[in-house]
């Protein structure tokens, strides 16, 4: 697969997380448009183009990891109707300064180097609570942290 086709996953309301394969070089127009439950996207270094409205209306999107050292070209309204001002964008350490000046990437509320992506349970911070118990489990192939009857992913987001 070298391209995620036009409208390929558009409207998939049950899609919560996407990791694009390393073989992909382009994400076409409206590919993930209106995936309202999508919370995170992982874009590989191989992607050079992201089409018009590719992630438009992904209203739950809060984390984007873009591993492309060379900033991918982007069509119009890639993140329209996405709360990117409160989302986190992780980019290659050596490219942070470039992404800061390139649209639509510059619109993200928080931009951090990829080296700061939480990678394990040890990176999750939970406020001190004397009676709390924290337990790491694997659920559906994902690491989940259980804390006071709630479940969290390794990014610290509450999950069901």
Where do the language-model regions lie?
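C-terminal outer-membrane/trafficking sorting elements
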Residues: 118-160
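Structural signature of tandem-repeat unit edges
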Residues: 1-3, 12-26, 35-49, 58-73, ...
